[in-house]
Regions:
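A detector for short, charged/polar N-terminal pre-domain segments
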Residues: 1-2
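Short basic helix-loop element that most often maps to the first helix and adjoining turn
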Residues: 5-20
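A charge-rich, low-complexity, intrinsically flexible signal that marks solvent-exposed coils, linkers
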Residues: 9, 24, 40-42, 63
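DNA major-groove recognition helix of helix-turn-helix/homeodomain DNA-binding modules
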Residues: 26, 45-63
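Recognition helix of helix-turn-helix/homeodomain-like DNA-binding domains
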Residues: 26-42
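Helix-turn-helix/homeodomain-like alpha-helical modules used for DNA recognition
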Residues: 59-79
Length: 79
């Protein structure tokens, strides 16, 4: 399960303002702000939509010792 902090970090890594991510996930910018701040707990569907939009944008979520997020490595091919 992704956290509001991960969502905010992923959005920042992509350089996306809230008004770019929110419509991709089908939520309002106000709701996105509240999710990122931990003031609103999104539904499973909303979390899935946010995760899908961010992953499509080029990030991947990690869950090692602590939850995190990083940019995907693109265009690398094995020789």
């Amino acid at each position: 399960m992704i956290t509001g902090s991960q969502i905010r970090a992923a959005r920042k890594l992509l350089g996306w303002p809230r008004d770019r991510l929110a419509p991709k996930a089908g939520i309002s910018t106000t709701m996105l702000k509240r999710i990122e701040e931990g003031a609103y707990v999104p539904s499973i569907e909303q979390r899935s939509a946010l995760r899908a939009a961010l992953e499509e944008g080029g990030v991947e979520f990690t869950n090692g010792d602590t939850p995190g997020v990083r940019l995907k490595i693109r265009g690398r091919k094995a020789k």
